[in-house]
């Protein structure tokens, strides 16, 4: 009998002994980060950055394929017995010698996963991982001059870039309520002292919101720079309009943590949402994503980036109609129709197959 046949026979015997579980289930207990298993990671440390932000150090399993600076990773976290998926920018350099990766998370009001990771996550905790993805990255050929325009947690993908690639001429404008709210502030000021970065901090509690028109004074050559911008929708909307008006829109690269949502009339007032697989029915307005509606109702909803990019939330629409919060387009139920629940809201009564 060949060695392959012997291994196959031994595996079948193990399956008989371990039924109803599989041998792989026990292997997952012994070696959860092994190759061949679902991609997992182990939290090895949590380092506070500000009062409401922390860096989470993760050792990914053997199936991890690495990342490009600026990309994000979807992470599945068990919170109060429910697995929730979120997407966070990777803040570690690509060549970290110990093989670990970091994400830096800012806790947001009512954010189940962000608050869990910042305030409750412990070393040793296992999390699910997807492969890194995203196109908010620097080109292979380093730009001669770069501007980073960031606000709040929008600094996280840019910090991954700063740690990974040293540029000859890099300028950053970063907005935060107060100096103590600037994530990575000490590290940024070390880069400034080493003349690797020119930094302007806008403290919105005292300075007010950044007026994009101030760029002419803060960075006189901004229109000549390749710009990477990440932050709240208001900042990015203003930047896109400003760059477009000056004919240099192609030099602006943006990353949104939430989709841009259009405001519609009174006709889009929502409706009754039925989650047929779980038998739950709730009322929803016409502006709240069905993903949020389901989670609030206790329905286990697949999710990922929560901004309409990764398609991790796609779900069959069995009946009724929904509205795309980005475009206002109405989708009506018909056989085979899938919707993105993170960017779709009820447009009247609807039935979601969850």
Residues covered by each model-derived region:
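A short, sequence-level motif marking secondary-structure junctions
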Residues: 90-94, 286-291, 328-332, 345-347
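Iron-sulfur (Fe-S) cluster-binding modules
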Residues: 1-35, 353
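A short, compositionally biased
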Residues: 69-71, 265-271, 309-311
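Local cysteine-cluster metal-coordination motifs and their immediate loop/turn environment
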Residues: 157, 299-324, 334-348
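C-terminal accessory/binding modules appended to enzymatic or scaffolding proteins
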Residues: 268-305
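Ferredoxin-reductase
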Residues: 26-133, 137, 144, 169, ...
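Short flanking/linker segments adjacent to small metal-binding domains or redox-active Cys/His motifs
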Residues: 205, 285, 348-354
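FNR/FR-type flavoprotein reductase catalytic core
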Residues: 5, 115-279, 283
């Amino acid at each position: 009998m060949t060695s392959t046949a012997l291994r196959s026979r031994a595996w079948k015997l193990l399956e008989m002994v371990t039924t109803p579980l599989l041998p792989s289930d026990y292997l997952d207990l012994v070696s959860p980060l092994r190759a061949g298993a679902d991609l997992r990671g182990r939290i090895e440390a949590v380092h506070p950055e500000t009062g409401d932000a922390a860096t989470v150090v993760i050792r990914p399993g053997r199936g991890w394929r690495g990342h490009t600076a600026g990309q994000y990773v979807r992470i599945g976290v068990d919170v109060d017995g429910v697995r929730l998926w979120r997407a966070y920018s990777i803040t570690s350099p690509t060549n970290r010698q110990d093989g670990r990766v970091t994400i830096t998370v800012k806790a947001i009001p009512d954010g189940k996963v962000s608050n869990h990771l910042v305030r409750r996550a412990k070393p040793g905790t296992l999390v699910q991982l997807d492969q890194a993805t995203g196109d908010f990255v620097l080109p292979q050929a380093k730009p001669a001059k770069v501007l980073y325009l960031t606000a709040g947690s929008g600094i996280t993908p840019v910090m991954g870039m700063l740690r990974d690639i040293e540029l000859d001429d890099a300028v950053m404008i970063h907005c935060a309520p107060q100096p103590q709210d600037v994530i990575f502030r000490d590290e940024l000021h070390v880069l400034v002292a080493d003349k690797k970065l020119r930094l302007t901090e806008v403290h919105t509690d005292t300075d007010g919101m950044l007026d994009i028109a101030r760029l002419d004074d803060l960075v006189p050559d901004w229109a000549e720079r390749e710009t990477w911008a990440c932050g709240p929708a208001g900042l990015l909307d203003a930047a896109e309009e400003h760059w477009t008006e000056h004919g240099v829109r192609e030099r602006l690269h943006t990353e949104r943590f939430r989709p841009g949502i259009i405001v519609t009339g009174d006709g889009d007032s929502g409706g009754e949402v039925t989650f047929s697989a779980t038998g739950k029915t709730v009322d929803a307005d016409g502006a709240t994503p069905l993903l949020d509606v389901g989670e609030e109702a206790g329905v286990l909803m697949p999710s990922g980036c929560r901004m309409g990019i990764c398609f991790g939330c796609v779900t069959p629409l069995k009946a009724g109609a929904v509205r795309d919060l980005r475009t206002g387009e109405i989708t009506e139920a018909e056989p085979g129709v899938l919707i993105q629940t993170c960017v779709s809201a009820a447009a009247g009564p609807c039935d979601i197959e969850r």
